Curated annotation (Swiss-Prot):
Its cofactor is pyridoxal 5'-phosphate. This is Cysteine synthase. GO terms for molecular function: cysteine synthase activity. The keyword Transferase applies. Pathway: Amino-acid biosynthesis; L-cysteine biosynthesis; L-cysteine from L-serine: step 2/2. It comes from Staphylococcus aureus (strain Mu50 / ATCC 700699). Pyridoxal 5'-phosphate binds at residues 76, 180-184, 268. One of its GO terms (biological process) is cysteine biosynthetic process from serine. Homodimer. Gene3D superfamilies: 3.40.50.1100. Its EC number is 2.5.1.47. InterPro entries: Cys_synth, Cys_Synth/Cystath_Beta-Synth, CysK, P-phosphate_BS, TrpB-like_PALP, TrpB-like_PALP_sf.
Length: 310
């Protein structure tokens, strides 16, 4: 049924569809389903936390229209916050590692936000440090996606229950999500574990920065994943296992899914699908594996992910 008109674009965040992968999954493997979070109005899963963090601050009297928001972001949270701020009448300033794609930078500017780039070698730590400096210098409000409880909470209240509704009458045997802030994994994982006590919750992290696995942080190309530290928004008790994914592996899977499934997905989505397929092979036929595709491939057309010689 078609949705009724809404008063504000933020009202259409959530309610994203789920699609079964048909061509990239082996016949003897479990069914793999992907939740298309890039169908949110700002183009990514981060729209959910952007609205949740702003509305929490409004309820607590921390911000009013005309105020300025500052946030360190690898891109998608910034884009979510930028469009929510534009819709609600706030100004926005974002600090971001210089290694992030040109599309991400341009999208932030298109929504009227100011962008401050930090050294790529410092990863998200550099962006976080710069945001703190700007906050202290100008008195800006910082939502702090890596610490804000509204982040995992919105996934517990929306994304998780949506999956329960979408899979009503079925059992989800494994749920996987890439860990950036860990909000999706923590919030959805909590809901699904309550409904399916035997479910396996799997964290996905970059092979080149295996911090969750006890390794050292390092530079990697899986934009949005692997912040280089364990965020306060990640419930480390919620996941049962970790799958590490390499840069090239994630990119190859993103390209395959575009060509073989008609789903144009971002780099972290490629990592999620690769990990989900590995888990599906392990579980075998008759089981159900679900993952989340955080963002759309159009956000990466200037990156090596979708650069073509001809």
């Amino acid at each position: 049924m078609a949705q009724k008109p809404v008063d504000n674009i933020t009202q259409i965040i959530g309610g994203t569809p789920v699609v079964k992968l048909r061509n990239v999954v082996d016949d003897n493997a479990a069914d793999v389903y992907v939740k298309l979070e890039y169908q949110n109005p700002g183009g990514s899963v981060k729209d959910r936390i952007a609205l949740a963090m702003i509305e929490k601050a409004e309820r607590e009297g921390k911000i009013k229209p005309g105020d300025t928001i500052v946030e360190p972001t690898s891109g998608n949270t910034g884009i979510g916050l930028a469009f929510v701020c534009a819709a609600k009448g706030y100004k926005a300033v974002f600090t971001m590692p210089e290694t992030m794609s040109q599309e991400r930078r341009n999208l932030l500017k298109a929504y009227g936000a100011e962008l401050v780039l930090t050294p790529g070698s410092e990863a998200m730590k550099g962006a976080i440090k710069k945001a703190k400096e700007l906050k202290e210098e100008h008195g800006y409000f910082e939502p702090q996606q890596f610490e804000n409880p509204a982040n995992p909470e919105v996934h517990e209240l929306t994304t998780g229950p949506e999956l329960l509704q979408q899979f009503e009458g079925k059992t989800i045997d494994a749920f996987l999500a890439g860990v950036g802030t860990g909000g999706t994994l923590s919030g959805v994982g909590k809901v699904l574990k309550k409904e399916y006590p035997n479910i396996e919750i799997v964290a996905i992290e970059p092979e080149a920065s295996p911090v969750l696995s006890g390794g050292e942080p390092g530079p990697h190309k899986l934009q949005g994943l692997g912040a280089g530290f364990i965020p306060g928004t990640l419930n480390t008790e919620i996941y049962d296992s970790i799958i590490k994914v390499g840069n090239d592996t994630a990119m190859e899977m993103s390209r395959r899914v575009a060509k073989e499934e008609g789903i144009l997905a971002g780099i972290s989505s490629g990592a999620a699908i690769y990990a989900a397929i590995q888990k599906a092979k392990e579980l075998g036929k008759g089981k159900t594996v679900v993952t989340v595709l955080p963002s759309n491939g159009e956000r990466y057309l200037s990156t090596p992910l979708y650069s073509f010689d001809d």
